[in-house]
Amino acid sequence: MPLYESVLIARNDVTQQQVESVADHVASLIEAEGGAIKKREYWGLRTLAYRIKKNRKGHYMLLGLDAKPATITEVERQLRLNEDVLRFMTIRVEEIDDVPSVILSRKSDDRERGFRGPKPPGRFESGRKRGYDDREEFRARAGGDDDDRGLDQE
């Protein structure tokens, strides 16, 4: 049987368990026709590139499928009918890797390096911290006290 990879995006207001139940439904459809699920990854709640059906975020799920083309057609029909699924895409692949996908490996790399690191200084910042009072520094450079302003002359 040919191999397929399917990515589906579910609405952001559903829970992870509901997304897993959609994947379980797909798995039951495929296994009923003699196919198998080779890979299953939950990518988490991610920001969409643009709004889809008034949603800015969605739960992503990757499925590696081993099924007949007629079964894939039925799975896609069921996904179209499911209101929780915003979008899906199924493509035919030569092989399904057992290693985690690039999306999952990138998430772990971000955690290891502290995500983004410290914020660099802005274009117009002098490097001083906010709330820095430079009056003490000015007085030290001027070499005088407040009494040397010439206001005491009467």
UniProtKB/Swiss-Prot annotation:
One Pfam family in the UniProt entry: Ribosomal_S6
Claim: rRNA-binding is one of the keywords in the record: yes
Keywords on record: Ribonucleoprotein, Ribosomal protein, RNA-binding, rRNA-binding
Biased composition (Basic and acidic residues): 125-154
Annotated region described as Disordered, given as residue ranges: 107-154
UniProt keyword annotation of Ribonucleoprotein present: yes
Any one annotated GO CC term: cytosolic small ribosomal subunit
CDD domains attached to this UniProt entry: bS6
Gene Ontology BP term (one): translation
Purpose of the protein: Binds together with bS18 to 16S ribosomal RNA.
Family stated for the protein in its record: Belongs to the bacterial ribosomal protein bS6 family.
PANTHER family the record matches: MITOCHONDRIAL 28S RIBOSOMAL PROTEIN S6, SMALL RIBOSOMAL SUBUNIT PROTEIN BS6M
NCBIfam families: S6 (TIGR00166)
HAMAP family found in the cross-reference section: Ribosomal_bS6
Protein known as: Small ribosomal subunit protein bS6
Native source organism of the sequence: Granulibacter bethesdensis (strain ATCC BAA-1260 / CGDNIH1)
Phylogenetic classification of the source organism: Bacteria, Pseudomonadati, Pseudomonadota, Alphaproteobacteria, Acetobacterales
